[in-house]
């Protein structure tokens, strides 16, 4: 495929979700408290955490937005469990999925973090809009230096 970029044409290979995702994923049990989930997110410098059931199956995701929503509605408490706050209707990506397709999902569903899962639905990593933006900045920087 040839893509016009700044009056030039550049050939590229599609970038896959697995190329840019953060891994291993940061996870928490659905029985953990939201306080524990938030601390784990902070300690790992991530904006989301995947929620697993006792069998290690991905059952949800908690994002910074979820925690801010809960805090602003005075829902946070020492006993609030991850399962009570997590988003359950997950939008996921496969490791071989083109990043452009993942970006479309992010736009369509108004989300910033997508779990990347294998064929059995086990989490492999997380692809965030920040991961994609960082890649875009590096790519643009390379392009500018080459001109």
Q: How would you name each of these model-derived features?
A:
Residues 1-147:
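Tandem CBS (Cystathionine beta-synthase) repeat/Bateman regulatory domains
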